[in-house]
Amino acid sequence: MAFSKRTYAKRRANRVKAADNDLTEFEWIALREAWAGCAYCGKTDVTLQKDCIQPIAHGGRYTLTNVVPACRSCNASKCESEVTSWMRRKKLDEKTFLERLAEIRSSLVLV
């Protein structure tokens, strides 16, 4: 069943609103500084968006341990995909991403 962009946007907004979202502006700034670019492709000269590693549609939330900065291209491409399978399809370096994610999570969660 096909949905219009408007219907999709409204449903997504309702899912986001219903999720427990506790990422603060301070935490978002810290995440952007720690990654220093798109967490997926590494681009640094682009505007970064909040991307949930576990998508909202699959029970994810906007929290310090579930959000990474992503460029618009990666964020749109990943959409509601599971991060590791999406990275494999895009031929991105999954191992480096996961190692970096663990390193950044441990440094930020302890702060």
PLM region spans:
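Acidic-enriched, low-complexity/disordered segments with a strong bias for Aspartate over Glutamate
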Residues: D20-D22, D45, D51, D93
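Histidine-centered nuclease catalytic patch
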Residues: G37-P69, K78-S85
